[in-house]
Amino acid sequence: FDVMVVAAYGLILPKEVFEIAEKPNRAGCLNIHASLLPRWRGAAPIHRAIEAGDDVTGVAIMQMDLGLDTGPVISSKQLAISEKETTASLHDSLATLGGEMIVEALNEYDRHKELPSNAQEVDGITYAKKILKEEAKINWALEAKTIDQKIRAFNPFPGASFEKAGAIIKVWFSSVSSVVKSKHLSGEILNISRLGVEVATGSGSILLVELQKPGGKKISADQLAQAMGWQVGDVLN
């Protein structure tokens, strides 16, 4: 073979495999990485970009080396992150972009038998650590915007969640709501309407739009609230 291609591997390539790809007259191993390196090296760049509230991300085609996403970059392209973006939707957009970019890189190699690249910048290095299930539990004491970012980042895995009456409820969609002017407990239900369930947070409030109870289907938040008998003033854990 002429070149080895890896997509979203998230780990350090075994030395034995790396050495095979680096033999003479081969282009080495190329990685399609879902971030604008050196930001978000590591296993979960899409999740962490949304969780951090980044406005833009992208794809980098990089020449792999023995480090974790430390190799020189052959090409990169940006992609905006919308206010409603989830990891699921952004993953699909980046996958399409990455597919187009790797074809361009391989065509370039086929024509010229080389792939010019540039070393990554020293400044701006961040690491996208692996997502853990325990991160998904919502902390209502955080500000509404931060909670919304986490909900979108953890959709589809592991799914942001809270507890109510012993049941673990997953939150799939939400939006930042109005600023709470009077004093309320973090996690207190402020309103239930066809728009969703509005919950007080450490700063502002958040509107829960789509929820799922254990063993159930994803349904609108107001439907679940009615089915489970939630009331304004109840506090979510």
Question: What feature does the model see in each segment?
Answer:
Residues 1-3, 7-9, 205, 225:
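Glycine/proline-rich, flexible active-site/cofactor-binding loop segments
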Residues 71, 126-130, 172, 181-182:
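Short, solvent-exposed polar/charged micro-motifs at secondary-structure junctions
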Residues 3-127:
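Donor/substrate-binding cores of folate-linked one-carbon enzymes
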Residues 140-237:
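An anion-binding loop in the catalytic cleft
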